[in-house]
Amino acid sequence: KDAPPMPSILGYDVVGEVIEAGSEAGNHLVGKRVVAMTRFGGYAEQAKTDYRACAIIPSDWDATMACALATQYCTAYYAAYECVQLHNGFQVLIHAAAGGVGTALIQLAKHKGCYIYGTYGSDDKKEYLLNQGVDIPINYRKVDYQKEFFNLSEGKRLDVAFNSVGGTTFKNDVSLLDKGGKSVIYGAAERSGKKGGIFSTLNLAWNFGLMTPIQLLMNSQGVIGINMLRIADYKPLVLQHCLQDLVKLTEQGVL
């Protein structure tokens, strides 16, 4: 139900100059160059969004680079800095680490001094992950990442798992968590591109597995789900904070 009615102009991420504000609350943005998130409609010459979904950026920033701060980096920031508290030395697993959100998570986690395991699916991505700061890249197509983690972690368990794949990987991640560990899930790529309609969706749900709150309670663990559309709709000030802090971190050279 999150899909827009057809015909529709797609696009979540925009960069440009604010030419008009619909209320006095957004007047301070008029004439400013901003990065913003939209509820679709971004692939157009002009776009409309909530003034709280904008952050002012330097006039000399590359538009393509700045656009990445919207959906991809906002998702990563919300996952890594709002939903959990990363600490120096934390053992962190990032699925699909070479993707947009994965890259952002690497940079944010490395900034906090975390030790990072990152999964990837093609050999050409390994060098990229090492350059980004991943300590242990794991090719999930060649090895069982769950077993590989246990082989390489020297008895340590995960403090945080960031998962955009879902399904069976979610169950595996939970089994890797340390006491006090958290699993943060923000996607279900295991379902993407598969035919079968409702049956594929039910299979995905089955693969996620079942767990009881008492299991989490006894181990002081947590499972956190993220849908940035819900944050944009119901917590726009949180979204604004994420965007503004991402701009600061970029200016500081962290990202």
Regions found by a protein language model. Give the residues of each.
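NAD(P)H dinucleotide-binding glycine-rich loop of Rossmann-like/cofactor-binding domains
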Residues: 3-7, 12-13, 33-96, 137
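A glycine-/small-residue-rich N-terminal strand-loop-strand element
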Residues: 15-39
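Mid-domain Rossmann-like dinucleotide-binding core that forms the NAD(H)/NADP(H) cofactor-binding site
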Residues: 29, 69-143, 147
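Short glycine-centered segments of the SAM/dcSAM-binding site in methyltransferase folds
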Residues: 33, 91, 115, 181-182, ...
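Short, glycine/polar-rich helix-capping loops at beta-to-alpha or helix-loop-helix junctions
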Residues: 42-45, 121-128, 210
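Glycine-rich helix-loop-beta junction characteristic of Rossmann-like nucleotide cofactor-binding loops
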Residues: 82-86, 153-154, 175
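Short amphipathic alpha-helix with an adjacent loop that forms part of the alpha/beta core around
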Residues: 144-156
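Glycine-rich phosphate-binding loop and adjacent beta-alpha segment
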Residues: 168-252
